[in-house]
Amino acid sequence: SGTYDYAIEKDLISGMILSLLHENTLTRTTGFEEIGEQGFEHTTFDVIASNIPFGNFRVFDAELWKKGGMYEQATKTIHNYFFVKAMELLNEGGLLAFITSRGIADTPGNKFVREYLVNHADLISAIRLPDMLFMQTSGIEVGSDLLIFQKHTRKAALSQREQLFLQVGREKADATGTMTEYANKLFTIPKTTLATGSRIVQNQYGKYVRKYQWQGNENAMSQYLAALLKLDFGRYFRKSLFMGEGQGSEDLSLIHISEPTRP
């Protein structure tokens, strides 16, 4: 038994650095859509993790295009594509862990992706991250979520949390009745935000949104995030499903995806 660690990095220089820092990781400098051409020992994986890119640009993936329907639709925006492609590459019981823009959870038009995810996997954890989280590294405020799923294609029904994850809503922004932009209803319940507070503000586009803040040091934030994840994994993660329920394989295959277009 052993762990097989793979990494995909699209940027050449970043890929070279990554391969030097992690000598035991098999690194390929290419796009995620070309993973099937890399000659990895595994074609499906137990864990797929990334801070994924976002944007309204298409990805050419012949395999998903041939499937048509929502698979082809997912290739029209890169963040939707990453979720669907990764879920297709997971072993049953495997974990998908992505930091992503809030568009996946909040945009009404992305409901088809949310439906695909909760119908193919159990929602383990959904945590709304503070808007300033990437300020030091990227110099911009960006709304992000940490979403973790465990692939479970034979699930009987959606949980209450998963049903909430499908829904979006708006809030009153002021006394005149101006409404905020849409936001996912799951983040209205306790223990789903990495924040000490939130308020409605106007963003750089003049739209009203709910902004999340963390007032405290990074160590305290890390400890609170760890506590949230421990709580969610204790409640929702199925170890027997992850281990294959006695199917015999003791190898663990992990893939990390890094993309230069994401802060």
Enumerate the predicted regions with their spans.
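Mobile active-site "lid"/loop adjacent to the S-adenosyl-L-methionine
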Residues: 53-82
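Flexible, glycine-/basic-rich loop-and-beta segments that form/coincide
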Residues: 136-250
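Conserved nucleotide-binding/hydrolysis micro-motifs of P-loop NTPases
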Residues: 54-55, 103-105, 133, 153-155
